Amino acid sequence: MLTQFIPSEDFTVITKAALDTFFIAFAGTAFGLVLGIPLGLLSARNIMPFAPVRAFARAIVVFSRATPALVFALCFVRLYGIGVLAGLLAIGIHSIGMIGKLITDAAEEIDPGPREGVIATGAGSLQDLYTGIWSQMVPTVISISLYRLELDFRSAPILGWVGAGGIGLILRGYAGSLRYQELLGITILIVVLVVILEILSATTRHALLGKTETDLPGKPGRMTQLFLGGTTRPGKKIADWMINKSANKEASESESQISRSLTPPWTRERIKVNSIGLIFFVLLIISVLVPDIATSRIVDGSQKLPSFIARLTPNDWSWFTDRLFSDMIVTIAIGFAATGIALLFAIPFSFLAASNTAPGRFIYLISRLFMLLVRCVPELVVAVIFVAAIGPGPKTGTLALAIGMFGFITKLFADSIEEARQGIRDGVNSTGANRLQESVTGVLPQVAPSMVSHSLYLLDVAIRSSTILGIVGGGGIGFLLMSAAKRLYFETLGGIIFCIFVVVFLVEIIATWIRRKII
């Protein structure tokens, strides 16, 4: 019975595809960081004084975030051919959006005190940027980088559906030939790989930034803290090490000897930080060199880029048909409906997945594990399974997207609940309130603004994700998008991409306006 779920391909083929998927995610994340961090800093008001430069940088960040990675992959496959290169570029450019936005927010929220002290010493602009700004942002940048790597590894298998390399190519083959048992087997493999990556990411995050304490009865075990524990706050380990490199808590030498040292001592923390950095550097080199990325394809594809953009640009409005308009309405409706369904189940479930409101440790662990497993399955894969089970259509796409959004938003809600202040809860408890009354009265009012903000962000993500579900029969604009790409209707393809960008951008503007009015 279980043999039906084992892929028929050779083990080496599956292994190579899985490694290619990891290389796409890792190198793509690095590419996004290389471009996203400078763009994010240029978008910050307290760093870049020139408004035109800020506006240009923000425009690139918004475009990268508003355009789905699958759309980028579709275009790059046409430019560079089927393979890892298209997926790497798609992941990288789409990552710029999230990384750039979060870097901008982090830069604008830094403490101005250290920066003023650095400027008072007569430091130049670059010295101010590194010592006064960057040293405060390092913990946040590490958290953003690791979280983005997790997201990219979850989305990388989807890109193979349009030929962008990795294990998604095998998924597309199974779905096209109706081999759903083997498709489910590959899906389970993807979930296992994502879980492993999340564990490694959590290990790295805790090693660099430290851990947070949970509020569960009893002392959580090491694996509980590592695998299911609370969120990591921007910690002090890296920041303190950067700001005060000469500190050596474990050295036996006297303070006078340390102060006379011209180089920072090799403490355990410094060795750990440099070792992790070296490992990531080696992985980056491997991710670029091991996959079959021919330099000639990069050169040839880049030369075609201007003409390809010109072909994507519509000359008139003939592409804007009634079918396209109705499919865009369906896409928006799928996004709204999936958001509503996800929130309906996520709000109560998040209290079970938060360490300070869960009825017990066992329920907390089970809730966190379930949330992790749901979050690990890409929405497009869930849509394929639902299409096979109940048939194609918008209802199928809505249910599939709701499941994916549930795992995403529940984690954000649970993390916000764990940040609730204990004092207010103690006051409610002193009146004799039970656990439910305490959660509703002492916790929910505290986290309501965060929940509203996260819900609006969820709607933004859901609208963006709903645009690709039609590729596998989940309803919406995705079918026309894929059809235009296959038939080489480039003006129609460009028009659809433009519509997707406008809709997602408008939703983001409206959500930002609502967030500012409510919060």
Protein language model annotation of sequence segments:
Residues 61-95, 371-404:
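Generic hydrophobic transmembrane alpha-helix motif, especially the helices
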Residues 167-204, 477-513:
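Hydrophobic alpha-helical transmembrane segments of polytopic membrane proteins
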Residues 1-26, 30, 201-340, 347, ...:
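N-terminal, non-cleaved signal-anchor transmembrane helix
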Residues 82-148, 199, 392-443, 449-461, ...:
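Membrane-cytosol interface at the C-terminal ends of specific transmembrane alpha-helices
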Residues 1, 163-173, 300-308, 473-483:
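Short hydrophobic, aromatic-rich alpha-helical segments embedded in or entering the lipid bilayer
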Residues 39-73, 102, 349-383:
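Cytoplasmic-entry segments and transmembrane alpha-helices of multi-pass inner-membrane transporters
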Residues 25, 29-37, 41, 45, ...:
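Hydrophobic positions within alpha-helical transmembrane segments of bacterial inner-membrane proteins
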Residues 15-23, 57-64, 150, 325-333, ...:
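Alpha-helical membrane-interface segments at transmembrane helix boundaries
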